[in-house]
């Protein structure tokens, strides 16, 4: 049984079917991860190309992929895989809040009512930019103040299979929060169909 068959079997056991939402993260040379309402999994790269596995899942299930940005779709297209439908977290952020700033840290901050000006900056550590010794999980995706950690938002999510799995779970969480926000837009009832 190939890797794609094993993942497909897991999706069937989870009840994922045609058109169901499924968060997807692809990290070349690391693997891929999926998340859904009641679970997640990470598929490390061995000999299998993550795009190949996604292509087989697309053909068998045709889910609506939840992706952080269109970079995921671009990676798949470059590998010869075309997906039919996506929930692009960055694009939905633009529908909800306007503007063009839709990087993961900004999306997360807006959905969690955190000030954009307090988004942590990335870059090398210096006198005024040191790790917080009070952080509950110094390797986790979230800081104690609720913001995404700068290293994660800047690509550190792709460091290993465990991190890509967590990044997929966060994409699912953002999608769920965006769905709630869209439902609150009574004055624009058609916006949810655009998302």
Range-by-range predicted roles:
Residues 75, 84, 94, 107-110, ...:
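Mixed-charge, glycine-rich, non-catalytic linkers/tails in nucleic-acid processing enzymes
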């Amino acid at each position: 049984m190939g890797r794609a068959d094993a993942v497909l079997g897991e999706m069937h056991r989870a009840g994922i079917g045609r058109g169901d939402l499924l968060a997807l993260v692809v990290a070349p040379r690391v693997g891929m991860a999926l998340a859904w309402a009641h679970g997640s999994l990470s598929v490390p790269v061995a000999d299998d190309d993550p795009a190949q596995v996604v292509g087989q899942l697309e053909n068998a299930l045709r889910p609506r992929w939840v992706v952080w940005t269109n970079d995921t779709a671009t990676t798949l297209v470059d590998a010869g895989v075309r997906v039919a439908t996506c929930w692009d977290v960055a694009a939905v952020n633009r529908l909800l809040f306007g503007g063009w700033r839709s990087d993961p840290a900004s999306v997360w901050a807006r959905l969690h009512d955190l000030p954009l000006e307090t988004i942590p900056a990335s870059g090398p550590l210096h006198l005024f930019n040191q790790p917080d010794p009070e952080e509950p999980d110094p390797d986790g995706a979230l800081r104690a103040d609720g913001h995404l950690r700068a290293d994660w938002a800047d690509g550190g999510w792709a460091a290993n299979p465990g991190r890509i799995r967590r990044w997929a779970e966060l994409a699912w969480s953002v999608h769920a929060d965006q769905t709630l926000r869209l439902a609150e837009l009574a004055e624009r009832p058609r916006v949810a169909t655009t998302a």
